Amino acid sequence: MRAVIQRAKEAKVTVGGEVVGAIDAGFVVLLGITHEDTEDDAAYLAEKIAHLRVFEDEDGKMNRSLLDVGGAVLSVSQFTLYGDCRKGRRPNFMAAAKPDHALPLYEAFNAALRERGVHVETGVFGAMMDVSLTNDGPVTLIIDSSEKLGNR
């Protein structure tokens, strides 16, 4: 499971001209799911994201977490995070999980964030979405559950 995390001042996702999810300060999380992912991967990423210390404290140091600042997450499913661009000019998406496997894990990830006290807004799984945000920093991180310690 792969997450691209962008610290945002505000963000929203629109489907068919209608806003379906919006947050003020927090993270936009683009989440990609692969075939081997499980609910353990979802829980690992949720725990990591809820506690990442990338918000500034009173001294201007990145020392506060999403929970510390009362931030929210705008969670957007993104199968293209598993695009393989090594060969040719068209990405290969064979590593991305099919919807019947990915949707329950996407929902488990969002539920795991909520269980940790994070307010979560979402896009629409599988839909064409317009995502807009005001980057804060910018701060952008990539976390892959396959790279967690003890998993090498």
From Swiss-Prot:
Motif Gly-cisPro motif, important for rejection of L-amino acids positions after renumbering to this chain: 137-138
EC number per UniProt: 3.1.1.96
Group of enzyme by EC: hydrolase
Disulfide bonds: none
GO biological process: D-amino acid catabolic process
Function: An aminoacyl-tRNA editing enzyme that deacylates mischarged D-aminoacyl-tRNAs. Also deacylates mischarged glycyl-tRNA(Ala), protecting cells against glycine mischarging by AlaRS. Acts via tRNA-based rather than protein-based catalysis; rejects L-amino acids rather than detecting D-amino acids in the active site. By recycling D-aminoacyl-tRNA to D-amino acids and free tRNA molecules, this enzyme counteracts the toxicity associated with the formation of D-aminoacyl-tRNA entities in vivo and helps enforce protein L-homochirality.
Entry's free-text remark on domains: A Gly-cisPro motif from one monomer fits into the active site of the other monomer to allow specific chiral rejection of L-amino acids.
Protein name (record): D-aminoacyl-tRNA deacylase
Protein species of origin: Geobacillus kaustophilus (strain HTA426)
